[in-house]
């Protein structure tokens, strides 16, 4: 019975070994005595439940090769398509992947047209599929194809398996993923690249979702150690640049980690040079568990058909006398330290003249591992210091022999700065002399023989080869030489386009290149942007640097491994040439020695290295029951799509919290009626509707940004040929000009409500692409086309500029009483014929127009002002006279289409004396006029009074633009301007007054704010609207195409004007006025001269106030204070006359005139009579002052003098009108002074002589009387001349002046109330007030 149990159990197994069982039965029958014991002892294990355990381990003599790799299972898997693969041991760490039996019957080899079938590649691939293989092939012989085919077949065989391709750098990873795709077409949805730039959490997700991974060894090592990498699913590992697998490099750590897990893994290692020594190659085999070595070189019979001729040339370059001298000097430094080492017992085993830095390093390591016996421990430090000095010195000597004197000198200088070498050599005389010798040689140039030879080789090469198609690589092991080579190549000429290709690490002398820059350099090199690359060791391996025709090795003292890598860059598709530059002596000898050792290594690797190396067993991975047969397949490969930095398809969206609480039915309903914005993202196209992007959209309150304006300008510039006039006019009227928008003037814009425009219709003025023609006549003409007058749909119209309207905090709109009105007619200059079109009409259609002012406030309503246009037309050239009111408003008018045809924007200027009778002058201005003393200020170039002038109007794009221009121009009281035309003459009298501009506040919700278009650049000829006198300077005329001043000009603070400057300017520029001034008895003694001389007056005491006492009586004037008597640079004067048309903005009204504050406060403390203080207080701000005019006053003594009058533009326009009707105008042009001009209270006449020491009281008492006399008191001063102001102030007692000023101010407070009611009118139409208030402060701050 004991024997039946195992027999019955064995019968249950279909694969029972019957022969073994029969022998056992026979033995049991023969030994009947102990049959029970013998049978039970042998068959007892078979009766145990785990029967398959014994069956999987039968006696060794009965086993076949198949039993080593395949384990029997008791139950077959349910999936008949994939058979589970079990290892030798059944445990939890067994592989979790199964093999596809159908796919395992074949293995695929590509036969695409771009991938020719090569015998050596096919043979190596067949071997690598079934064993761990080290493939050693020279560069360019197709190692990547072998790896791609192996990866693809394992991808087919194991549907759940994962394949890893490891490369030492990120560029190589990206390069290999594309190469493998182009060879076998592994689907991209299964491939991914994992580098250090991928976060660990994302890598964990990718390890589960992908199957083919291209990684760096460092990332693979970290993921395996952290458990992120699913090692149980790995079936194939490809290692590129396998010669790095030494020591504890990541390749070695990864393989050790994987071998610790009981898995079956296929390893394929690729390299061009496994090593230069047998020990190194054996180390690679051990670290990577290699079973087979596949080695090929260019001389093998199966490789020769695919390798082109590669010519190797070794050129011996003489070291040079200079380098030889330095080498001998260095040897004198080396000898003492080598002798000391020998005395200590260290054996260097070679002549010290032929030693290399590497050999010294090996000797030091040997000494550290086994110190010399008998050597005292205290001497170990001396031995180490000698080794350190020799290593540095031999390295300097190597640089000297390989690269020249300059790299050697730079290294020596760096080492002598700090560190142990510097401390050891600080007192060494030989090293100091060596450094001095290097400096001397470098000062004389010290050309490197290698550089000269290299340039010669390059020039000869490009004479034979086409520089556009030929490529050259120059290898240098030292970065310093890369710089020298680049400098030398820059002197060859245009045929050489060189660039450097170096590593990422930045040194002290040369900055490294990032991987992005490296890829860009290689791409440009392939495209032909460069034809020469100067590379360090980074260009030797790995990267695909296309086929080159010539390889130049600038240094020959490199290992055979690296030399093979360099040589592999040429001779792939065409014949190649390799030139090695070796200096005579040590460098050439070292090169020859290393080449000999390389040839010996090749012999060891012959026939797979079976006689020289020990290999490791590896699993077959494919069971023996499957015998895969090759199947040549032509792949249809899709185009490779590089993956971006961010995978949008992997964007993880978090489910909203409310959806987690919904039922499935509610979620379905929500998805039915709600579109997820993440699914369909709106992508606004910037080129879909280009026409609409040339115009801004309508806005309310919130204006378009500056960036929007820039975009619109760019779109208009791109569509210039197709950009219509109508579109441009729409753009101009709606938001901003077609030009620059850096500074914009804010104004009001009328809404679209028809009730706001009862009798006014929007008129669109087209200005884009208008061209002005320059003619020879003094007045420029305007040329318009029919297209310019096309009428478009109504748009918004600017009714008022910012200077005419303001908005308070409650939203009430206040319109100033002096806006400007523009009609849709244009004035043609006399030399311009009217356009002969069908739409040509005269101006008679607008003979009478009612103007409706805009009023949005119930409390501030204004009466409608009616302007009558009186028009006379005569065919023979009779003149038409247009009389307009002085108070006009800017508005849009209802005109017919016929009027639009000939209109650009007409200015209607009216004059009515009745309207100006009620004007009142301010008390300060009254005193200002009476005294006749005003600060000197430049004016426009003006002719004589009452002269006829030709008035020109510029081409403007909109009334708003023209209004700002006109507001910037000066105007004159009671001035008639006659404009001559071919068909009509227009004579207009204008009394336009400048008014300080007000800041426009925010409007209420019912109003729209717009921006007044004021372009910075005009391309139309502009004439001076106030004067076209022939004596006018060009500085005051804006020529065609001339860029105007920017709107917000920086404030210019000038020094005060000196007394006498005005009078000297009048005398020199207007000799006629000087002659008419017969009161002057003598001329000036000395003229104002450039240089360092002071301006000297004769006898008169100058009333002068020095700004903060900068110029004393003994100080000299600087060169920039000299008076420029010939210049008209009025923009540099202290007082701004608003001469620039475009410089009048709202910001000017908001500025505080600190110089006016200073001037008033200073004069309020001076001991001058009250009339001078009042006059000084009447001086105006450079930001609010209007144009300067001259008034000829009739004197009682029949004297005539000129006194300056600044007419400020204030709301009190009636008083200003009366003030300006004093007499006839005489326009005087005053030249501008220098930039540092001091201000002085002076008029065109001389100041009176005042004895300030003795007559303060007398003048104080006579203040009121002198104020009554007004201009007469000033006339008597004309008989005096100017005197030296510095000498005058040298005699003043300022303390007494301050005391007297305090006394005078106290008297003024007591008399303030009486003076406030007293009004003295010296001339009809003028009023007088001293301007002192009841509660005036003791110190006048100058704020009004």
UniProtKB/Swiss-Prot annotation:
| Positions with biased composition (Basic and acidic residues) | 1308-1318
Q: What is its EC number?
A: 3.6.4.13
Q: Which GO terms describe its cellular component?
A: nucleus
- Residues spanning the membrane: none
What happens without the gene? Reduced fertility.
The Gene Ontology biological process terms listed for this entry are: DNA recombination; DNA repair
Record protein name field: DEAD-box ATP-dependent RNA helicase FANCM
Q: Which organism is it from?
A: Arabidopsis thaliana (Mouse-ear cress)
